[in-house]
Swiss-Prot record:
This is ATP-dependent Clp protease proteolytic subunit. The keyword Cytoplasm applies. Disulfide bonds: none annotated. Fourteen ClpP subunits assemble into 2 heptameric rings which stack back to back to give a disk-like structure with a central cavity, resembling the structure of eukaryotic proteasomes. The gene is clpP. InterPro entries: ClpP, ClpP/crotonase-like_dom_sf, ClpP/TepA, ClpP_His_AS, ClpP_Ser_AS. GO terms for biological process: protein quality control for misfolded or incompletely synthesized proteins. GO terms for molecular function: ATP-dependent peptidase activity; ATPase binding; serine-type endopeptidase activity. The active site is at S106 (nucleophile), H131.
């Protein structure tokens, strides 16, 4: 019986290249990594975050002066996993250009906005959604209170960072993230989450 990751891996296309030493095959994502393109697809979680961080660090070591392109199609996910990616994006020397394909929701939207100013893009039919961090902790009342305090602290910190990346006042961010807030690509530009809608490769 095959698990979901086996099936997914079987569906990843392979690219065959001719080299001086003969043929070499890559999975499509490894081949795109050679072009400094990283895909952030699906739920943001610890394993995925570690892979993204490793790719960012590898590309920095390869060429610290060349831009990295992070393509995002994600419904969001773990704040801590997302912050590991975000902090690495800010830490490394290359500019990280972010591109939303499909959707960038929740932590996906935060990472989209965290790209290099002037190099954050949406494709025309993509959607962006921002909201406050989700809770859901269960346990003793005292532990629930501790986690509630932690979530409020994270919420305030994320709002401050979104305000910095978008240019929106903090009170506007607080109001607009109180509930799920969906935006078209054009609205995301107007809001400051991205810099422009990309219809054709320049």
């Amino acid at each position: 019986m095959h698990n979901a990751s086996d099936i997914q891996n079987a569906l990843v296309p392979m690219v065959i290249e001719q080299t001086a030493k003969g043929e070499r095959s890559y999975d499509i994502y490894s081949r795109l990594l050679k072009e400094r393109i990283i895909f952030l697809v699906g739920q943001v979680e610890e394993h995925m975050a570690n892979l993204i961080v490793a790719q960012l660090l590898f590309l920095e070591s390869e060429s610290p002066d060349k831009d990295i392109f992070l393509y995002i199609n994600s419904p969001g996910g773990s704040v801590t996993a997302g912050m590991a990616i975000y902090d690495t994006m800010q830490f490394i020397k290359p500019n990280v250009s972010t591109v939303c394909i499909g959707q960038a929701a929740s932590m996906g939207a935060f990472l989209l906005a965290g790209g290099e100013k002037g190099k954050r893009f949406c494709l025309p039919n993509s959607r962006v959604m921002i909201h406050q961090p989700l809770g859901g902790f269960q346990g003793q009342a005292s532990d629930i209170a501790i986690h509630a305090q932690e979530i409020l602290g994270i919420k305030h910190k994320l709002n401050l960072m979104l305000a910095e990346h978008t240019g929106q006042p903090l009170e506007v961010i607080e109001r607009d993230t109180d509930r799920d807030n969906f935006m078209s690509a054009t609205q995301a530009v107007e809001y400051g989450l991205v810099d422009s809608v990309m219809t054709k490769r320049g």
